[in-house]
Each structure stands twice: as structure tokens, then as C-alpha cells.
């Protein structure tokens, strides 16, 4: 109990992915809870669990997902509890509870995210074309990982994990409707209407004999706000930030340079 009392403190609860201490008087982001090492216990012998008194915070291991009230609503209070249990004797347990307040969302932040979503949808074709003309694709296209705003507030695209992890939250491709990992289908985030010409997922181009139109389809969601579409299903703002279908039709130039003759 002494170890839990000493280590489960406000200073040891950080915002996920940062070293910033979470604001107990106004939580705004997801949480990284103290691991066994931080609590001074051996994970081999002790189990650490976290729980909340309300569904404003949910836990999966050491990650706490924070659900903020809708913009314009009041702040909410919740209690976060750390429970350490001896794996060999469940009666040996220690707990400690801390009080937190969850801050409502900011309408201006939501408005900015809506603008980012619209920009990502509008720029989808340009992003995957990788500098090519939609009417004359001759090389591989490029699947992106995230759309975000750069330091100058301009739309930017991440194509690699290092950048994706470094730039913070943004708009990301999510599983397309109908995807089933058990079905053996190859597409998940980037679907192609003609896989013989443009491959799914990585969008590699195989030059056809004739000029061929191909449609690429994805579904975009806000990393930060998509979860709220399910929590607040009647809120139109959140609906626009989750599962937004987008597509781009391109023409891949064939070796003949001709349009396929119509069969009569």
C-alpha cells in the first residue's frame, strides 16, 4: 500500500504520448497511467489495474481514453483508481483513488478539425497522385498515413510512420465498410476498382495496354474526434468527423496510348 500511495500521484499521470503531466482540474487528452516500474512493484508478481468511477474515462491496460463533454456543456468529475493485486493471493491488494475534472470540448477546436477534414477530402486525389496528373498516371501512386496541419497551418500529408507519430493528431484512413480480415480480401484502407492496374493498399501501378480509368476509395476519420460520433450519435458535427468516404478517379496511360476499343 505504501508504494501505491507514494507512486500513484497526479505528477505520475501523463498525457498519452507526451511527458506533460495531465491537468487534474481539466483533462483534455488521453492518459498514460503509471506502469509497474513507476509504481515500484514487479509485474511478474503483481497485477495493476485502472478504473474510473464514470464512463468519461475508459481504460485499456495503461492507456486511459478520455471522453470530454460536448462543447457548451459543463465539466464533469470522475475518480480514477489504481488497484495492485498479488497474482498469487488476490486478498493481498492495495488501492488509491484520485479526483479529476474533465473539460468540455472547445467549439473552435471542433471547427478547425472540420476544416481539416474538408481539406483532406478535397486534397485526397492530389495526395495519392504523388505529383502526377489525374488524367495521365504513368507511375506508382502513394498511399498516405495522415493528413495534418504543418507549422504554418497548411495542409500536409504524412507517408511514413516516423512523420505520422511526430505530427500529432490528424485525419487518417480507417477501415473501409465491408472490410473483413477473415475473408481473404486484400483491401482495407485503399481500395482499387481495377487491381490489375492499380494495386490495393500501396497503389502500385501496372501499365495496361489501353488507357484505363481506375477509382481509388478510402474512408477518413478524425483521430481526435471520431470516437465521439458513437458517443453522441445525434451530434451532426461528430458525424462529419467519422467514416467519411472519399474517392478519386484517375486515368492510367496504356502502352498503346489509346482508349480501349468498344466491343459492339
Protein language model regions, located:
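Beta-rich interaction/scaffold domains
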Residues: 1-264
